[in-house]
Amino acid sequence: MDIIQKMVFKSKQQPLVPIGALATTGAIILASKSIRRGDRIKTQIYFRYRIGFQLLTLVALVAGGLYYQTETAQQKQTREEKLRDKAKLREKLWIEELERRDAVIQERKKRLEESKAELLEVAQQGFEEARETETREAQLKKEEIEEKEN
């Protein structure tokens, strides 16, 4: 809220205060004009008006402050409901974020398990091929030895 919006908002909340301020300003302007003209009686009257308008403005300001200081039960309930709704929304967003993170973690675990299984399979194939090669080599050596003996 910028300053103009804030002034308009406060003026709508307490409409007697700006009216009293304008009336006080008007009384001061009229008093200054009567001073220039040299009319002492009118000057005194306008200054008395100024004091009266200032008093009314001050009373309106204090009364409005007291009125708006004590929230009505409905306003308080509405404010609390807004805060509750905001908290629920935050909680919902947080839960969604946690679920998203959990899904990412589960996907990573799944890929890791698949990768491990694939590596184990490749390693098993390599071991089997190595055994077969060793078995063939052993058979070839055995055959060579048998041929030499014959």
UniProtKB/Swiss-Prot annotation:
Basic and acidic residues composition bias: residue spans: 128-150
A Gene Ontology term for the protein's cellular component: respiratory chain complex
Membrane-spanning residues: 15-32, 45-67
Main localization, broad class: mitochondrion
Membrane topology, as annotated: Multi-pass membrane protein
GO BP terms: mitochondrial cytochrome c oxidase assembly; mitochondrial respirasome assembly; regulation of proton transport
Keywords: Coiled coil, Membrane, Mitochondrion, Transmembrane, Transmembrane helix
Residues in HIG1 domain copies: 1-79
Record has Transport as a keyword: no
Cell compartments where the protein resides: Mitochondrion membrane
InterPro entries, per database record: Hypoxia_induced_domain, RCF1
Top-level taxon in the UniProt lineage: Eukaryota
Subunit structure of this chain's protein: Associates with the respiratory chain complex III/complex IV supercomplex.
Record family assignment: Belongs to the RCF1 family.
Task performed by this protein: Cytochrome c oxidase subunit which plays a role in assembly of respiratory supercomplexes.
The name this protein goes by in its record: Respiratory supercomplex factor 1, mitochondrial
Organism (species): Meyerozyma guilliermondii (strain ATCC 6260 / CBS 566 / DSM 6381 / JCM 1539 / NBRC 10279 / NRRL Y-324)
Biological classification of the source: Eukaryota, Fungi, Dikarya, Ascomycota, Saccharomycotina
